[in-house]
């Protein structure tokens, strides 16, 4: 597995950066390699990526998500197999330090072509720059999902639970 770690500071509060990051369907607006993201359910997304003539799709499960803190995912597809974590931390200036850590498997082209690891590092850094330009340019998030996910399951907070015991429709 190849490890990638990139950090960027954005000049918006943690809540704003986190809220925008949870809007996966908006990623094509600022990430050049992301063509489409479908949010199948709160913990499952389908991604279409393209770089030059190369195009691929994969599904990712959100394993853990904590508002204003972090999001952990893993791909459900073998090629290319990967997992990652994005963390959000406040900076002294009131902005956000956003750190992406990924592990990318050797299967697929990354395991066969020399230099692909370095290209992947640069690609993640470039896409984070695009996120920075986007969120600082608009200054506010386009939406938010403030749910918590543990072990791939949405966890309802105590304040959301229906006290009477009568079933209710989930929110979020």
Report each predicted region and the residues it spans.
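Glycine-centered tight beta-turn/hairpin loop motif at sheet-sheet or coil-to-beta transitions
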Residues: 1, 53-55, 79-81
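Residue-level recognition of beta-strand termini and adjacent short loop/turns
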Residues: 41-43, 67, 92
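Beta-strand/loop substructures that line and gate deep hydrophobic ligand-binding cavities in soluble
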Residues: 61-63, 74-133, 137, 142-144, ...
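Short, surface-exposed linear segments at secondary-structure transitions and domain or protein termini
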Residues: 65-71
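Short beta-strand segments that buttress and anchor functional surface loops
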Residues: 45-51, 71-77
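Intrinsic-disorder/low-complexity, polar/charged segments enriched in Ser/Thr/Lys/Arg/Asp/Glu/Gln
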Residues: 3-7, 44, 57, 70, ...
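Hydrophobic ligand-binding cavity/cleft-lining segments
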Residues: 1-44, 130, 136, 153-172
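Generic structural detector for well-ordered beta-strands
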Residues: 7-11, 38, 48, 61, ...
């Amino acid at each position: 597995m190849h490890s990638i770690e990139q950090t960027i500071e954005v000049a918006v509060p943690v809540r704003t950066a986190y809220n925008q990051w949870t809007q996966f369907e908006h990623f094509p607006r600022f990430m050049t390699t992301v063509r489409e993201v479908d949010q199948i359910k709160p913990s499952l997304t389908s991604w279409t990526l393209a770089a030059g003539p190369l195009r691929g799709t994969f599904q990712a499960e959100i394993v853990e998500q904590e508002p204003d803190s972090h999001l952990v995912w893993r791909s459900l597809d073998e090629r290319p197999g990967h997992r990652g974590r994005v963390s959000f931390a406040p900076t002294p200036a009131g902005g956000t330090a956003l750190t992406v850590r990924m592990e990318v498997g050797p299967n697929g082209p990354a395991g066969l072509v020399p230099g692909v690891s370095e290209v992947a590092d640069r690609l993640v850094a470039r896409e984070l720059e695009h996120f920075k330009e986007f969120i600082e340019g608009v200054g506010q998030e386009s939406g938010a999902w403030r749910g918590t996910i543990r072990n791939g399951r949405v966890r309802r907070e105590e304040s959301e639970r229906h006290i009477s015991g009568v079933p209710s429709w989930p929110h979020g």
